[in-house]
Amino acid sequence: MLSNKNDPSCHFERSEKSISNKKTWDRWELIAIYFLQKKWYKIIDSNYKISGGEVDIIANFNWKTIFIEVKYRKNLSHGIPEESLSKTKKKNILKVIKYYILKNKIKEEDIRFEFIAITEVNEKAKINHFKDVEL
């Protein structure tokens, strides 16, 4: 469990057993969630799916709704994580964002898209956080 004593909204919990039973990707997504919470993001949802698309993390930060894509690479033999955000992937993410803001009556000026790239270096996570990414 990760929580911040000063902010009850900064809380995300999974048991150690559930973490160990999840696939590798979930481990890195959880690391991204912890990373965001340490920066005072309030996590709203993860793995938000509609037909034809998914957003890894949805959060609130500074009165904005933030949509976050997370990419992980164990090594760089397949390229850096930032290169994996293709036009098709961006199009699918945009479709999900449009659906979400329509469903939840959120203004376009109150949203932002971010990207978290995680690489494993000496068994530790190296995290690059890109804000205001253009879709």
Question: PLM features: what roles do these ranges have?
Answer:
Residues 1-4:
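An acidic/histidine-cluster motif and surrounding catalytic segment
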